[in-house]
Amino acid sequence: MSMASFKSASKRISGTENVTRISANTAINSIVKKGELNVISLKDGNTADLEGINDVLLDYRRILKNEIKTAVSPITMKLKKDEHKKKLKLGTLKSITDKLRKLGGESSQPFIQFYKVQCMYIPLFSRVDGDNGEITVSLIDDGKEAAGQDPIIQSITFDASQMAMVELSMNFFVEKKDMDFIGIHVSAENVPVQDRAYGSINLAFFTNEQSVPMMQEEKKSSYLMIDAVNRPNDITKSSVFKSIGDRVSEEINQKRDDYKKKLIENEKLRRREGKGVKIETETRSSSSSDGETLLEEARKSVSLNISKFLADQRRAPPPPQLEKRTFQWPCGVKMLTMMDTGSSSHYFFSKNITPTSVEMNFGGVAQLEVERAKLSFETFGNKFLLKDVFMFSDQSLGDNILSYTLLKEEGHIDGMRTAGDDVLLEKDGEVVMILDSRDEGRMWIKDDVWAEVTEHGSKSAREYCMKVEKNEIKVE
């Protein structure tokens, strides 16, 4: 396949104008120079982005050695006689996760965090003159396909005669009951091989079972062209996987000392860095329906674009001895704080939830009762009075929710950024509140894709809350 046709295919499927192709040798030199084991992602402008893809080369070795227990290894693909294209469904998120669960035991968590899937492809035929065919690997949502929508979450096409590592990612959580909808498909077109295996694929899903799904930054798909080692000619058996993995790993290990030295330098730099959060707001549709209020119409769709920046010492967070984000009821029950950015698709899960007869829910979790209330408190010398907050009725859960939208609309804050594990709410450049993203508080962010796939026809928690009588609750 020519470079022109390769770029055309990639533009058609991934939507990027140019595709970065980096050999393993080039990638190794690059990660040593930058002190990173993040290798590549597809970006406009034909540039390599070393952010966001986790240890592709190291994962490559672990997959080939079957050290990643979620790997399916290997799968061989054939074209029948007179067949120019072949489609295969390699597996689903459920089938892979079930295998992992048998190894690690049953979990009661309701969500599967699915952050990437990797496919290691090795061609089993020799390169020939002319077009060598194309391989397309796709991350598919069968539920969307059944609904008549585009099912492709991410997809990438590459040269069928070239050994490669392909990585695709999602940035939302999947409920266990929906895991069978998420699958990996591979298709081959114009491969010059018939009646025998033309390729072999190792497949690995990277998953994590969670109780509270924290959205993460969207990643791009990646394509690592493995040409640092010579691909054996006209292979017919898959026994070469281990030897190829060892050879690529050996090449990485030769650079390990240089990498560690640069990594230490980068760690020192990171200690002086923070992460900035840019808030982009978009007003929702003003079309009203029965029961909808002005407050509901005013809700914002908030997206967070995370970008690194060198922390400005003039805007440093308050010293750690200051009181942080932990409020207490008069009865002595401590309250943890969660930031609500305006999304109706947030979830909360607790094993200790006691079902009630009132069928109200927060973000789709059945029988978790919530109520709308007023909340006043004081922190860092600033007094806050929120007209509307959404709180769990069962105080033993120990959580309340603050609304970023309302805080901003009522003039309490004008911006938000992060520093380390903290989310900083600011006004006029001064920090007025800190939320801890670890145990002492939680920040929930919006994800439009997740909101789409979790729409099951039920009303949002916010619509339920509008019908609940306000309560006057003061937190000292």
Curated annotation (Swiss-Prot):
Which organism does this record belong to?
Answer: Citrus psorosis virus (isolate Spain/P-121)
Q: What is this protein called?
A: Uncharacterized 54 kDa protein
Tell me which Pfam families the record gives. 30K_MP_C_Ter, 30K_MP_core
Record region (Disordered): 274-294
Q: Where is the composition biased (Basic and acidic residues)?
A: 274-283
InterPro entries from the xrefs?
30K_MP_C (IPR021479), 30K_MP_core (IPR041344)
Tell me what gene encodes this.
54K
